[in-house]
A protein has these predicted regions:
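Acidic/histidine-rich alpha-helical segments that form the ligand environment
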Residues: 1, 55-95, 99-122
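His/Met- and acidic-residue-enriched segments that coordinate or traffic transition-metal cofactors
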Residues: 1-2, 7
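Short, contiguous alpha-helical
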Residues: 9-54, 93-149
């Protein structure tokens, strides 16, 4: 939320170099990714379409407040889901092959952290000084690529 709240409405529409996507898409997707694990648990499927839907769905969140409210909602859903630890062992079909919900949520967390790292990399390009970017020690136990890109 701290990163999202540093941006103006105009900066949410800023398009990143290399892989063109808006900051709105990048940051909303960071919140959205863990819920895909919950949906995979419920449906038994984890598809490429699920992974790509953020490209359009993020457009429904126009302000930083909208994005943060969505993040709050997802955090609550994930906390409730994780109260039932037995759900994590369920194997689901995915475009990567069979995978447990635990592995999906762990991948989602690493993916979200990686996108937050991307956002902080892009901030100076928009004239924004990152406010207390996430320290690598905070996610030392999460599988996050060493390379930024």
């Amino acid at each position: 939320r701290r990163a999202v709240n540093q941006l103006s409405p105009e900066q949410l529409d800023w398009i990143s170099p290399g892989r063109p996507r808006s900051m709105r898409q990048l940051l909303w997707h960071s919140f959205e990714r863990p819920v895909l694990g919950i949906e995979a648990y419920e449906s038994g499927q984890y598809t490429e379409q699920m992974v790509r839907r953020y490209e359009e769905l993020a457009q429904n969140y126009r302000t930083t407040s909208d994005i943060c409210a969505y993040g709050d909602k997802i955090e609550e859903e994930l906390a409730e889901f994780l109260k039932h630890g037995d759900r994590l062992a369920k194997k689901v079909e995915s475009y990567m092959g069979p995978i447990t919900v635990h592995e999906l949520i762990e991948l989602a967390l690493g993916h979200a952290i990686q996108h937050l790292r991307h956002a902080y990399h892009y901030f100076p390009m928009m004239g924004v000084e990152p406010d207390r970017p996430l320290d690598p020690k905070a996610y030392a136990d999460v599988p996050v690529p060493e390379d930024l890109f």
